[in-house]
Amino acid sequence: MSEYILEMRNITKEFPGVKALDNVNFKVKRGEIHALVGENGAGKSTLMKILSGVYPYGTYKGDIIIDGEVKQFRNIKDSEKSGIAIIYQELTLVKYMTVGENIFLGEEPVKGGIIDWMKVYSETYRLLKELQINVNPYTKVMNLGIGHQQMVEIAKALSKKARILILDEPTSALTESETEHLLNILKDLKKNGVTCIYISHKLNEVFEIADSITVLRDGKTIMTDKKENFTENKVISLMVGRELTQRFPRAKHTPGEVVFEVKNYTVYDHEIPGKKIIDNVSFKARRGEILGIAGLMGAGRTELAASIFGAFKGRKEGEIYLNGKKIEINTPSDAIKHGIAYLSEDRKRFGLVTLMDVQENIALPNYDRLSKFSIINNNAKIKHAEKYVKELKIKTPTIRQRVANLSGGNQQKVVIAKWLMSDPKVLILDEPTRGIDVGAKFEIYNLMNKLVDMGVCVIMISSELPEILGMSDRILVIHEGKINGEFPIEEADQEKIMYCATGGK
């Protein structure tokens, strides 16, 4: 028996006008965790869609070999029969169905011509217990957090006797503890002989869990080797095709006068009216600085930002000042009129209309300035879109391209472009580089520095401590809805931030 459970040889895949994969070779050893890394657009997802049968045999060139046998998958069912299961970044569970119904959807056991529900739920219980997932099989998926939904997806894959498990950015929306649980599950699966292909931009996770690493760039295999023969910097330079001397381009900022101030601000849960999510928070942000806001998931950072922007349903109390003048914000329109912009942590749900093109998305919050007597100036709309595509280096064949077809990094740049066009005085960035490759991250960091130099007050919320420490001039730490620490960057380190984030005084 070959030591390689999977070989993909000379895989080439073309779309109209684009060669997505160019003679790619990819080999995975039996029972290993193999990380597949590369910038967005490098070809990782395309390669996995070929392996999982989404792109059927005949639409690509090359061979897929499993256990020494050439396979010609014509659909997803074919690949599942060979023991391949893929878990996408955007989960595919049916939220109105129970955990058990989701796990066996389309594969329900039958007894006497009807679905054997007793077996569905007993098997679900067994799978969840094996994975140490504390979830009731009868619970509807809509009542589970993202972390538990991710575990249910894994249980679903294992119910189909998956031998090769593909995970695409599995931790992008997980908390630190959920991420740790997931990585431990994958380590246990490895001990039980399951082979994992792990796609992630989070190199710390890659180096914790992977046995081998393959780097793709521009649709080509650049390097495959044991993890021990890589460093993070080496992986990054192979991914982007150039050496990044520093991951965080820290600029010398000179903080000026206070531009934005929040006083005695309290935000209440919109479903539990008496529950405080943010409790009597006060802070100031200055012109010419990046104010970082750190804290654990669930601390209330996103609710604070969304409430300031007028986009959170819960009741609020307190005062907001802009350039020393008290302002009232009840809706996002109010915030935009005052020059406050908010880039949400979930760009696809709250930042973009993905079925619209680049031009329309950039224009969306700016129709007041693009219109006269309620007539839209289409020439101005085109001119502004082309300007920001050029300035932000948005990779798109045309401003008429649907945003859904852009990479994550370029989608994020479109969101930034629409807010830049609104000429903000204050820009709140919530997880600005989530799900974005290292090259695009570097470009967004440079853009943040440029905005600060232009006099924009930048507030950055991030769950990545290296990002907070690498880009902030000053850091606030939120714990359970309260500010539990404040540090100038010269005095900040990971230990101090985590101490405050976990409730230390």
From Swiss-Prot:
SMART domains: AAA. Its main location: membrane. It catalyses: D-xylose(out) + ATP + H2O = D-xylose(in) + ADP + phosphate + H(+). It is a peripheral membrane protein. It comes from the Bacteria. Residues 6-243, 262-505 form the ABC transporter domain. ATP binds at G38, E39, N40, G41, A42, G43, K44, S45. One of its GO terms (molecular function) is ATP hydrolysis activity. Keywords: ATP-binding, Cell membrane, Membrane, Nucleotide-binding, Repeat, Sugar transport, Translocase, Transport. One of its GO terms (cellular component) is plasma membrane. It is found in: Cell membrane. Its EC number is 7.5.2.10. Belongs to the ABC transporter superfamily. Xylose importer (TC 3.A.1.2.4) family. The complex is composed of two ATP-binding proteins (XylG), two transmembrane proteins (XylH) and a solute-binding protein (XylF). Part of the ABC transporter complex XylFGH involved in xylose import. Responsible for energy coupling to the transport system. This is Xylose import ATP-binding protein XylG. The gene is xylG.
